[in-house]
Amino acid sequence: VADLYVFSFKKDNDEFITAQKYTELSGSTISFSTLSGEQRIFAIGNVDYDMFPGLSERLESWLGNNHPSKSDLTSLLAEVGGDKAVQFANTTSLVSGLWNNEDDTKDYCTVKVDGTLVEKGKIYLKRVAAKVTFKIEVADGREFKLKSYQVCEVPKKVNVWEGSTSEEIVSYSTQELTISKDEGFFTFYMPENIANGKEGCNSADDREKLSKGSLRNSPPEGRVFTYVDKPATYV
């Protein structure tokens, strides 16, 4: 984790308590100054990351006098910069997390007057953007040369917090991306937005079934999947 923003809110009325930023992190422990009492603690890390320009400015404004509400934070969207995010090769990824106790039954902590916690717990950080690798394997005696690929319906925005709801997510599709040498695999990066399918399907082939258009001859905007709502990312 290269940088970390931490926000604290009172449990009973969601009132803002404090926020701090950390830029020189080592190990897995930070020292956080807050008030005593029951509170929820949120953290966002690796904000200075090329995929989501503008997010750091938003969080920096919240460190000053422009304090966020809890709903401001939980509804926060990170917007992808440009249409080449899938090709970013940065090894760091935007992460977010909420303090939970050790057995994951409580999402708030109680800070005693002496600064120690009543409950044991941690802030569990989860990535907001995924690194996806496709590896092509063929049966014995068969041959397949990987020359190019296209990533369709890549989200332009992503919910920073897992499980939060947001406005309808706009998406884009890349141009055809060529592969200079045949290594049998390719890797791309994309924001994670999870949604359920329209209904269950009974076979692997059904996942690609189209009710409109074709994968080979139609542009992305001309395709409608039978079992999957837009925008579901596919390759």
Q: Which stretches of residues belong to each language-model region?
A:
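Tryptophan-paired
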Residues: 1-64, 131-235
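Structured interaction patches on ligand/partner-binding surfaces of diverse proteins
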Residues: 20-25, 50-119
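Internal metal/ion-chelating core segments
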Residues: 119-121, 134
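Short, solvent-exposed beta-strand/turn "edge" segments of beta-rich domains on protein surfaces
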Residues: 121-127
